[in-house]
Structure formats: structure tokens, C-alpha cells
Amino acid sequence: MNIHEYQAKAIFADNGIPTLKGKVAFSVDEAVSNAKELGGSVWAVKAQIHAGGRGLGGGVKIAKNLDEVKDYASKILGMNLATHQTGPEGKLVQKLYIESGANIVKEYYLAILFNRMAEQITIIASSEGGMDIEKVAKESPEKIAKVGIDPQIGFKMFHGLEVARVLGLDKDEGKKLISMIAKLYKLYMDKDMNMLEINPLIKTAEGDFYALDAKCSFDDSALYRHPEIAELRDITEENPAEREAAEFGLSYVKLDGDVACMVNGAGLAMATMDIINYSGAKPANFLDVGGGASPETVAKAFEIILRDKNVKVIFINIFGGIVRCDRIANGILEATKNVEVNIPIVVRLDGTNAAEAKTILDNSNLKNIKAATNLKNGAELVKSLVG
């Protein structure tokens, strides 16, 4: 689960992590009022959406007087902000964060995330903040520190010293940053985060460090332990189809291809997407119906994937272990009763009650269903139908 910058900064502040003063605004008048209340002569007017790259997309502006605050707020609030993370459709800006300015002398990058390959928590830091970290890693890898932390040991001074060394900090600056990272690491672990990112982390003329941006992502499976975090969910930022799918126990992620996938099990779903790509076609979604799929959930899955007008073929790939293939077959029939399906359906069913499922489909008189003998054959059929 993702949260907004203003929410992340409130959590930071509650845990002793330095942030600049700021207030959320839901209208232009409130934005101006917030700037007045914050005081000063410079403010950042920031769009609040669940995506990075807001500045490049025109969603972050620096105002040097209250008239500029009003002007920028009126332009950003209500805009459809498109960034490299939103796709061309963009996201509607419904709230702003008005933040006090600071005398910035240096920008850094700092993130804490789970490194699955190394089975460690990893701190990533760079002296090149405010930039695309992937670009920095490619062009100037020596400017990035990657420090692995064994969760059983936790964050120690030597971890922080390595970060300070790569960032080129002096002794006093290093002490301040290490203290800040220690608090961030504790927060990351205590709140079951997947990722914590500050880009940029700034150093002021006074030698102090502040989180100028804040991005936090939480493990959905651990939210039951953190009701105060779960309350921060903004469903307007989530894909409506993905949200609806989750309500029916379906794991759905929309992609930009033309082959809709319906699979049971995340591993098989990813393998199905891989072989579709390998065949020369492109998957339109990730969709895991899970082990307890019923005819009703399969019908709902059909309804969701058919809303995507880019879909030309549906590929159903089911291995009946926990889920029974006949349930999937009945779900297909249920779906075709309620939703008009005018595109080809390639079906590969194997495992529990596969023979019964084949009989159900054979007796259904559905003319647009094609049976695949195995996964490779299914991908080949899909590619031939897409063209």
C-alpha cells in the first residue's frame, strides 16, 4: 500500500525524522491560507499523487509570493498529471502539499528497501539527489552506496559510516545523517514497509538534513498489525479494476498488451506472461484467480479483463491442484451468460477434474474457445490469433 508525501512526512515527524513545515490543501484558498500560516517568503506547491516524477510533469512549483502560490495551486489542483510512473493517462490531482522553503546547499538520495536477491535490507544512498537514481547507477555507479543489513543484526554504526563516506560528509555531518538513518531504519522495520525513499534528502546552509520528499510503501499482508497505517489508504489513487478485483479475492494488475491472462497461482501467472512475451505477443494483465476460485470469481475475472478494449485474445491457463478445473469451466460458462465475449478464448486446463472440465466446455456450444494441449501450444495459439 502506498501513501501520499504529506502522510509519510507526518509519520516521519512523529518519529523524530526532520522534515520542513508543511500543510495539505484541498482547495486554492486553503493553499494560500496554508502558505500564510506557515510564514516565510518561499513555498513549494506540490501535487499529491501516488507517483514519482511530479516535478518533471509540472506538479511541483516554487512560489516566491502568495500570488504565485494562488496561481500555481489553481493550475496544479484538478490537473491530470502524467509522469513516467503514471503512464500517458496520468492521475487527477485532488490535493496539494504546501511546504516552507529552505536554504538548500546539497541534495542527496536515500532509500531503504528489501533486497530479495541478497535476503537483506539494503540502504541505497547517492550524492546525486533529486535525479533518476537508475540513471545515476548507470552513468556514475561510484556515486551510489549500497549497504546490506542483516535484519537479525539491524542497523549499526559501521553501516552509517559507509553511507557517510560515499556521500562525502565530514564528521559532524556524518553524525547527523547516521542518527537520521537509524531512525528511518527503525521506522521501516516497525511499520513493515516494502520501501522508504527520500529523493531528495537535503542539506541546508546550517548543516542540517531534511527529508524534502518522502515515499513509503507498506506490505499489504502486514496491514492488520498497523490499523493506523491502513486508515491512510487513498482508494482514489488505486486502479478501479484492481480494487474491484481485490474485493473478490483476485490479484489483478493491468498491463499494456493485448492478450488477457487468467491463471491460478502467481508463479504460473508470471510464467504464462513470460511465454506470451517469448511467443511475440504481449500480456494485457496479470491475473491470479487463486486456489479457491469459484465459478462466481471466474465470472468476475472475465468481466474485469473484458473492460480492457485492447484485449484481442483471452488465455486461460489453469493447473488444477487446489482449484478444480471443472469450477473454472463452469465459471467460463457463467461469464459468457452475463458478458458478451466476441474474442477468442484459448484454454489450457490440466490437473484435478481436467477431463470433466473438457467435457463441460465441449458440450457448451461455445464456438470461440480453442483448447491448448500444453503451455507452449497455448502461447502459439495466442500468437496466431493476435496476428
Curated annotation (Swiss-Prot):
Coiled coil: none annotated. ATP binds at K46, G53, R54, G55, E99, A102, E107. This is Succinate--CoA ligase [ADP-forming] subunit beta. The gene is sucC. It is an enzyme of class 6 (ligase). Succinyl-CoA synthetase functions in the citric acid cycle (TCA), coupling the hydrolysis of succinyl-CoA to the synthesis of either ATP or GTP and thus represents the only step of substrate-level phosphorylation in the TCA. The beta subunit provides nucleotide specificity of the enzyme and binds the substrate succinate, while the binding sites for coenzyme A and phosphate are found in the alpha subunit. Transmembrane segments: none annotated. InterPro entries: ATP-grasp_succ-CoA_synth-type, ATP_grasp_subdomain_1, Succ-CoA_synthase_bsu_CS, SUCC_ACL_C, Succ_CoA_ligase-like_bsu, Succinyl-CoA_synth-like. The lineage of its organism: Bacteria, Pseudomonadati, Campylobacterota, Epsilonproteobacteria, Campylobacterales.
